């Protein structure tokens, strides 16, 4: 049973964990909330952006001289919430095969986001992550791990972290090692960013895509939703499929022995409701 209400609602309705366990002790009662089942904010309203704001994650996303940026609702709602309750359900099902008993799962989005950010907490403990945006290797602070604007107003994503990939980035940009500061010289990152920004601004996104195609520079075009639906690689894997004229993601991950069936769309209008007699 999946409980998406605020804590205490199911109990008030007479369908709480204890009520259900009395009828079916094997039942897995999965509760997914933003704040969790206990704590000062447990019964407070919130959305993805609010849960992110309390975990430290939101403060780290965006440019240094602008407000933090909400990364859609991918991180807390889906990453820290849905995926963690799913893992919890699977784990509880596996454990039930041994014990024969169900249990209650408390999946809080603030907990899930914090687990997703464990590497960042480790980096903070070592002093390599600060309470400032664009000050870390993976938050856009490094010139070789950020997004650059092209001459047509579109963008290229650069992720040339390793030295061998960084070398190919320089080749693609028409630069030599002597033209830029040392890759990991933090004191000259502003200078390197300016050099890269100037180069990327000299060509269109498609021109840069052609330059870096087939290389290991880790440089790729930033696609819109519409463009992603027609992307060559995603099309080859059938990652985005059209069902009844609607683009949607195919199931993931993929299984070798028990593959998922085709993605469908729900019936339109009142067909589905009528079919069950409503």
Locate each region found by the language model:
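Residue-level detector of anion-binding/catalytic polar loops
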Residues: 1, 26, 218
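Rossmann-like NAD(P)-binding element
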Residues: 1-11
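Active-site-adjacent "lid/gating" segments in soluble enzymes
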Residues: 11-156, 160, 260, 267
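A structural signal for well-ordered alpha-helical segments within the folded catalytic domains
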Residues: 80-87, 164-167, 206, 271
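Aromatic-enriched alpha-helical interface/lid elements that frame and gate functional surfaces
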Residues: 144-215, 219, 276
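Flexible, small-/acidic-enriched active-site or ligand-binding loops
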Residues: 186, 243-278
